[in-house]
Amino acid sequence: MTKTSKDGIVTQWELHTIRVREARVGPGAERDELKVTNSVGIIADDYTGALMVACYLEAAGIYAPLVFHPDAEVAESSVVVAGTRARTIEAATAVSNVVEFLDGSAMGGSSRFVYKPSASFDSTPSGNIGPVADCLAQRTGWAPTFMAAGFPEVAITTHLGYLFYRGKIVTASIKRFDPLTPMPDPDLVRFLSQQTDRGVELVSHLDMCRGRRFVENKISALSSKGAGHIFFDVSDEADLRLVADLAARSKSVFIASDPVAVAFAKNIVGNSAIARAAPRHVSGPAAVLVGTVAPVIQRQLAAFSEVHPVLALDLTQSKNPEAIASDAMEWAAEHVGSRPFAIATSRDQSDVERAHAAYGSIGAARRAEEVLGILAREFRARGIKRFLVAGGETSGSVVSALGIKAVRGFPEGPLGTGFCVTTGEDPISLFLKPGKFGSDDVLLEALDHMR
């Protein structure tokens, strides 16, 4: 079913919405009586990005629970955000994880879905953005897929298909030091084309400067030509608004960076958004866990160490992760409950290089995540109530280790996004921070903010 209802035939997704409506409120229910027809499911490829989106939506007055399990229980909402660990795992597993959320009860009533990679579409030549986009297109029957990378507010942009990171072409930026996704090709159209057999075409910033009608005609031409995916430049805020609006009005799968996904969701739910009272932080002992190696976090740890103790682990020692964590617990014992402290899996880039030489980039990352996951469970058992976690993959390992299924994000504030509190009994507060974001004193300020 591919034609519109104007022709007397419903689309595949309209059929899905009718079935959801009849299952929940019975046949014949009016569209404006059913909030689910306007609901949006946003599936992010890491936990910090998922939380960032949830916080932006909360700041816009839209209740947006964040789930880490496909069947997590959440209150009725206009938008549900899901955090996965799909960025760096094997492509087939990443696709499977996304499908679990598509089919899970947490966002099973959503009528539109967005897959949200990082703002710079961090990935490898083999995936996982292309495979997920192909899967979503196949499941919905919608083609071509729309793709849009960029975050102009923080100087992450795309122009003529090329990715610029903080004002520099990505291969000349600090992004080139990323141990898992260094993005060796700045041409995202060419780079993404390695991840899919369906082809990637470009709608450039120059195209969008010629106006909506020109862009709509180009989309139509590319679609008629059989384009599998259409990539849109996001060079500035005007590009961002236009592509989000075009996606909201289309019947296309959308693969979108943080601010584009937020703009899309706001366009879909409009004035019907469900709002709820803001959450409150939990007071209690705090710990900082750092698994990222970005230069930014090194400066942040240096500022933190001027006030609180910091331990840097050596992942290259012959001990297994449990033994490394046990040694760290001995060091932390005198601090737990008495003062904040931080544990990092490296001191500097040289530590990272040694770990990579010993275990490979993926192996070293998984070793670090395992150690920090063990420590998170131990600290939680000993009464830690506030966790500050740096790094998207690290955040995923800590949240998973703690068995957290759902959180409520706090609206964006003076320190930006990243704050949340778990739902259910015995809550804890968390600050999940992307490794490359924040001022030098953000860890210290976050501690004060979470009181």
Language model segments and positions:
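Conserved, well-ordered active-site substructure
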Residues: I384-K385, E393-V442
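N-terminal glycine-rich anion-binding loops that anchor highly charged ligand groups
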Residues: I62-G83
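Conserved, well-structured core segments that form the ligand-binding/active-site neighborhood
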Residues: R166-M329
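N-terminal signal-anchor module of multipass membrane proteins
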Residues: N38-G61
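Cap/lid and interdomain-hinge subdomains that line or gate substrate/regulatory clefts
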Residues: V36-G41, Y63, V67-F68, A94, ...
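Short glycine-rich or small-residue beta-strand-to-loop segments that form or flank ligand, phosphate
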Residues: S39-A44, V80-T88, S111-D122, D233, ...
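Short acidic, glycine/serine/threonine-rich loops at helix termini
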Residues: V53-C55, P125-I129, I156-Y165, F214-V215, ...
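C-terminal structural cap/anchor segments
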Residues: R339-A390
